[in-house]
């Protein structure tokens, strides 16, 4: 029972975005990655190269995609190290998440009914961005998100 309570508390904390509001998008995401890595006993190699302020709605979009991707990696990849990079490229911000785990057959996932990939793509689309995925069995997975630094009007990725 205590374990369930702890899990609910962690989930509630993860769903709350006040850390992004308080620290700013990039620092908030970095802080969350550190905490998540410690909780999951895995190394998250976080790098960022963003000089501009990332609007909260874009930061929240990237944060939610990252959460889903890291939870999927924990569940399916079998790795203890994941690379996360957020970088500014012109008028876009890019998020890349890479692991060297089990990987999977993309066609099989497209035919499946899982909501994770669909929700990540939809979040990116809502702020005018795109999400691409590369994976092959036994060769790891790479997720690349590109979002314009100016979000679409009225967008919400929460």
Language-model regions: role of each:
Residues 1-158:
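Coiled-coil dimerization/phosphotransfer module
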């Amino acid at each position: 029972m205590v374990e369930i309570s702890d899990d609910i508390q962690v989930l509630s904390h993860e769903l709350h975005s006040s850390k992004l509001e308080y620290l700013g998008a990039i620092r908030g995401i970095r802080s969350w990655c550190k905490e998540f890595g410690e909780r999951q006993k895995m190394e998250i190699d976080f790098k960022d190269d963003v000089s501009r302020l990332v609007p909260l709605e874009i930061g929240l979009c990237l944060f939610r995609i990252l959460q889903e991707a890291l939870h999927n990696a924990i569940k399916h990849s079998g790795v203890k190290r994941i690379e996360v990079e957020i970088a500014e490229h012109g008028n876009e911000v890019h998020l890349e998440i890479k692991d060297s785990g089990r990987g999977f057959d993309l066609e099989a996932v497209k035919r499946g009914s899982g909501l994770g990939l669909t929700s990540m793509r939809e979040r990116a689309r809502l702020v005018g961005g795109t999400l691409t995925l590369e994976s092959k069995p036994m060769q790891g997975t790479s997720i690349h998100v590109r979002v314009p630094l100016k979000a679409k009007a009225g967008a919400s990725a929460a």
